[in-house]
Curated annotation (Swiss-Prot):
Gene3D superfamilies per the UniProt record, alphabetical: 3.40.50.880
Source organism per UniProt: Clostridium acetobutylicum (strain ATCC 824 / DSM 792 / JCM 1419 / IAM 19013 / LMG 5710 / NBRC 13948 / NRRL B-527 / VKM B-1787 / 2291 / W)
Its job: IGPS catalyzes the conversion of PRFAR and glutamine to IGP, AICAR and glutamate. The HisH subunit catalyzes the hydrolysis of glutamine to glutamate and ammonia as part of the synthesis of IGP and AICAR. The resulting ammonia molecule is channeled to the active site of HisF.
Pathway stated in the Swiss-Prot or TrEMBL entry: Amino-acid biosynthesis; L-histidine biosynthesis; L-histidine from 5-phospho-alpha-D-ribose 1-diphosphate: step 5/9
GO molecular function, one term: lyase activity
Gene name for this UniProt entry: hisH
Annotated Pfam families: GATase
Keywords of the record: Amino-acid biosynthesis, Cytoplasm, Glutamine amidotransferase, Histidine biosynthesis, Hydrolase, Lyase
Membrane spanning stretches: none
Stated name of the protein: Imidazole glycerol phosphate synthase subunit HisH
Length: 203
């Protein structure tokens, strides 16, 4: 079977670096903004950098939001990266209160820490709850972050990994077939590639 991952293009992400990472591990992926192509895929990646309200507006413009909600709820492996993870939640307070995709319960809030914001650079993972995409990833593994907002979870059972930055910041979350990755796996060396390979192997 010719498995393929749809990387969603909605003008809010560094798509090529994500695709290159999948190419490197031998995973078949393609970049698209077409709902029909997304529906034909075997798994979905929602990358993203930028502001939450702009991202939701862009997803809604051509109905991609409804497509990915339906595909995720129907059990297709789905992962959001960085801003893409934050979009999975119910709403965000970034700029103005904006509703998200509502696939994982919780709200995106402005980071409160005595450390510099944005949280940018390498930080280590604590892993309180294993999940499929963290297979082979050890506690203390370093990954690369760039963000100023964090996920406040409605259900702590959705938390798989976090980092310490003056406060606990969720780094990996999941609910059934849906995963959120706050850091950039495509910029996180072998650990990041392991996580992307684990996602590919869910198909």
């Amino acid at each position: 079977m010719n498995k393929k991952i749809a990387i969603i293009d909605y003008d809010m992400g560094n798509l090529l670096s994500v695709k290159k990472a999948f190419d490197y591990i031998g995973a078949n992926s393609f970049i698209t903004s077409d709902s029909k192509e997304i529906e034909k895929s075997d798994a979905i990646i929602l990358p993203g950098v930028g502001a939450f309200p702009d991202a939701m507006s862009s997803l809604k413009e051509n109905g991609i939001d409804k497509t990915i909600i339906n595909e995720a709820k129907n059990g297709k492996p789905f992962a959001g990266i960085c801003l893409g993870m934050q979009l999975l939640f119910d709403e965000s307070e970034e700029v103005t209160n904006t509703k998200g995709l509502g696939l994982i319960g919780g709200k995106i809030r402005k980071m409160k820490t005595e450390f510099k914001i944005p949280h940018m650079g390498w930080n280590s993972l604590n892993i309180p709850r294993e999940c499929n995409i963290l297979k082979g990833v050890s506690k203390g593994s370093y990954v690369y972050f760039v963000h100023s907002y964090y996920a406040e979870l409605a259900d702590k059972n959705n938390l798989n990994a976090y980092c310490d930055y003056g406060t606990k910041l969720p780094a990996v979350v999941s609910y059934k077939n849906i995963f959120g990755i706050q850091f950039h796996p495509e910029k996180s060396g072998e650990i990041g590639l392991t996580i992307l390979k684990n996602f590919w192997e869910l198909i």
